[in-house]
Amino acid sequence: MSELKDCPLQFHDFKSVDHLKVCPRYTAVLARSEDDGIGIEELDTLQLELETLLSSASRRLRVLEAETQILTDWQDKKGDRRFLKLGRDHELGAPPKHGKPKKQKLEGKTGHGPGPGPGRPKSKNVQPKIQEYEFTDDPIDVPRIPKNDAPNRFWASVEPYCADITSEEVRTLEELLKPPEDEAEHYKIPPLGKHYSQRWAQEDLLEEQKDGARAAAVADKKKGLIGPLTELDTKDVDALLKKSEAQHEQPEDGCPFGALTQRLLQALVEENIISPMEDSPIPDMSGKESGADGASTSPRNQNKPFSVPHTKSLESRIKEELIAQGLLESEDRPAEDSEDEVLAELRKRQAELKALSAHNRTKKHDLLRLAKEEVSRQELRQRVRMADNEVMDAFRKIMAARQKKRTPTKKEKDQAWKTLKERESILKLLDG
């Protein structure tokens, strides 16, 4: 009980910080969802509130460290007292040891040696006390308080967003405003190539020609005939390709007229809706003659290609006449193909890219303008800080003069007024 009464601890009552009253912005930010985020205008208030919380936490830590130090000092003082007590006991037990020879001399006449007996128990009693002191004198390991590095890491992460704008960042914005060299490449429309059916037909024909040449070469080797037939002539291949293209260009119905001529004739000729050609009954004829006549007049035979001269010139003349009358557009400005989905999607994305790049360029111009304005404001703020230092120097000089019980000189007063007016003028520029 006496140890508890002598305990020097103060047992401080730690008062917690009321977040709703002291830190309302911090409490509101914690109550938000993650998607809302934090605005730039809230950072200054948040900084003040977080510094308030940090100062409260550091104050509590200092009090706890002081209490821990008091406990350590108290334990050391208790150890010193025990050591002094043991020293006194040791000094009290020492005289019998020094008096042993005298007692032996006085009692030596009897020839008995019980003299040293009374001194032994004292030495035995002293030894355990020394061991006990050595046991209790072990240093107490005070646990180290872990360093709270969270505020430092927080302010280090926020620092890039609150730091002053440098000239390098302004140059970076100016470089971003320059149009890229390959910008025109993104708006080019590649030319339309051959249709896949034509390309595949040519590829199939080439493969067939190669396979045929390879098969002919193998057959000639088997027969032992090695001649000019084993190698495929490139001229023959080109001729076959041109022939296949000409056949491919010819419509399936075998009509020699062009597409424009056919469309014009279809617009001028009325369709027989009552009895179409396909539904008309075909008379049955027997015999060779009737078979020959039926074959010649059969609708199937009408689908066979027939030759009409000057079809290409007729097609071109009709096209020129329709263009001259204004019914067709000139080929110099090709009409858009509404069925080309790839081209429509490409132009749609190009329009979106143009709009987005224009929007980004506008925002970059605004950002560059704001950055230049902020740089000028930073210079004014630097001048304000310098003016503040000059005002504080003048104030210290005046206060030092008053402490020395002398009136400030006219020069000191004029200097103070001059610095104050300069500071006010800079503040007006900064606010304007």
Curated annotation (Swiss-Prot):
Residues modified to N6-acetyllysine: 418
Coiled-coil blocks: 40-69, 367-407
InterPro entries attached to this UniProt entry: Histone_AcTrfase_su3
Locations listed in the record: Nucleus
Phosphoserine sites (modified residues): 280, 298
Entry GO MF terms: nuclear receptor binding; protein domain specific binding; transcription coactivator activity
Region ranges (Disordered): 87-127, 272-319
Magnesium found in the keyword field: no
Keyword entries, A-Z: Acetylation, Coiled coil, Isopeptide bond, Nucleus, Phosphoprotein, Transcription, Transcription regulation, Ubl conjugation
Biological process (GO), any one: negative regulation of transcription by RNA polymerase II
UniProt cross-link Glycyl lysine isopeptide (Lys-Gly) (interchain with G-Cter in SUMO2), position: 21, 129
Residue spans of biased composition, Polar residues class: 295-305
Predominant localisation class: nucleus
GO cellular component: ATAC complex; mitotic spindle; nucleus; SAGA complex; transcription factor TFTC complex
Assembly behavior: The PCAF complex is composed of a number of TBP-associated factors (TAFS), such as TAF5, TAF5L, TAF6, TAF6L, TAF9, TAF10 and TAF12, PCAF, and also PCAF-associated factors (PAFs), such as TADA2L/ADA2, TADA3L/ADA3 and SPT3. Interacts directly with TADA2L and PCAF and also with the high-risk HPV oncoprotein E6. Component of the STAGA transcription coactivator-HAT complex, at least composed of SUPT3H, GCN5L2, TAF5L, TAF6L, SUPT7L, TADA3L, TAD1L, TAF10, TAF12, TRRAP and TAF9. Component of the TFTC-HAT complex.
PANTHER family per the UniProt record, alphabetical: TRANSCRIPTIONAL ADAPTER 3, TRANSCRIPTIONAL ADAPTER 3-RELATED
Homology family: Belongs to the NGG1 family.
The protein's role, per its UniProt record: Functions as a component of the PCAF complex. The PCAF complex is capable of efficiently acetylating histones in a nucleosomal context. The PCAF complex could be considered as the human version of the yeast SAGA complex. Also known as a coactivator for p53/TP53-dependent transcriptional activation. Component of the ATAC complex, a complex with histone acetyltransferase activity on histones H3 and H4.
UniProt name for this protein: Transcriptional adapter 3
Organism: Mus musculus (Mouse)
Protein encoded by which gene: Tada3
